[in-house]
Amino acid sequence: MNTCTKTNDSGISHRHTPKPDRLGTFFHLVFICCAMVGVVSLATIAWFLFSEGLAAFRQAGVIELVFGSEWLPPALFGIFPMIAASLISTLGAVLTGVPVAVLTAVFLAELAPKWLADIVRPAVELLAGIPSVVYGFFGLVVIVPAIEVLFNIPAGNTLLAGIIVLAIMILPTVITISETSIRALPPVYKEGALALGASHIYSIFKVLIPAARSGILTGVALGVARAIGETMAIIMVMGNAPAMPGSILEPARTLTANIAMEMSYATGIHASALYSTGIVLLIFIVLLNTGLLYINKKRVH
Amino acid sequence: MKNILSLAAAFTLLTAPLYHANAAVSVSGSTSVSNVVEVLAETYQKSSGRHVDVQGTGSSSGIVAAKNGTSMIGMSSRELKAGEAAADIQQLVIARDGIAVIVNNNNPVENLTRKQIKSIYRNEITNWKQVGGEDKAIVVVTRDASSGTREAFEKILGLKRQVNGIPVTSISAGAQVANGNGMVKTLVANNDYAVSYISLGSVDNNLLKALKVDGITASDENILSGQYSITRPFILLFKNETDPRAADFIRYILSDKGQSIVAEQGYIRVK
């Protein structure tokens, strides 16, 4: 080691001094910048929402706004019915959509004959590309009248219609991510289960799905985010009444619908109240994501 | 060289609309008023060659746009509120419009009184049976909180109440809310038991029908004679020292040609 250093000192040192790696530094910076785009956007959106929405919180009071049940701008700004509508529609969509999606993913990854998988998979992928206004229109002309006939109610623009549309909308996200994570499992899991005498179906439910849990939960988290953030389709099928829904067969307005419907006109404290609706929505998404991340970590360990 | 040329061409193409927009008369505001002003702008452009830029953004923002000068002309489909009027802003009624109470064509009900309409929107009458129709629940459809049509409808029928000293709507919170005339029409056309309200000029007779109010048909004659009571003005707002190009467009709207276009579109002429 010492000899080596000596040789360096005596004459050819310039060959061994590490050249500043300009290209490396450059790309390092590019990577950092790219990674920061998302973070900076989020920070800007949050800052914007808080700076615009705080006025309404200050005037109406946090409790009054979050737990108030009457939305009567510009006097009362209670968004509790909308919080309830957002949570119920998302929960309903997850409860109905996720089982269907996970079973579809298992079918595609494990059971489907190739020709059938080649029909189902592109169909699911196509579903992801359909704009939400088309889902809304589909809901309005197919699901809404169907609910009117099935439940014999005067108007089918209800929470239930929203739940069904959202359940369909989250399918592609959950299916694609779940299928990928099931396929990514090492083949020894399944081989081991089968070698121990487990049936194919038993190995799917007891080995493959539990092993792919982390990926499936990621899919569910993205599905939840899509469902709670959906606006256009929901406005078209859910009736948008700002009252507390008594059942899923009554109209309701979600947080996103409230912002979208009134933002273009609102001024002053009314506009501020809409931004605070956005703050509440943001907080919910953060809580949901944190919750799912936590479950994910806990189960994996 | 080629690159520079194409860059220059692209730049010209990109900035051309900006130049064009600067030279045009800008009008923004009520979506109901913009329906007729768009047609007026088209014919005006044909006869004078001058461009008019019309944007439907809602009455409230139209009034703001006229006051702060974002648009040369603002449009409103309701009277200005006390806080909205300004000394340097002129108001001009260019047409009158009736608000029709609409139901699905399959609904046998033909007539409602003002009192019944008010009770329906307050959720005091909830079944068509109570107003002479079938034994079916009424599906009440209203517009979003800041629509000019809704504001006028509430004001004319007295669907207002005070909360903490601030006037707010007394339309039942359980009513369905549609965010535009198009959606109101879709909802009523697809539901036999729905009731809503819409500008008379936008009623599509194939799918929905306008009810008589207190026995009076919603027609131009009855609005002109003052018998049909649910009407509202279409107002243009502009600064006292109006841009000459905007003033010329306004003169055109009030001319015989302009006013007959107003009538053709289903609204009531003022001259």
Task: Describe the predicted segments one by one.
Chain B
Residues 21-271:
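Exported/periplasmic ABC-transporter solute-binding proteins
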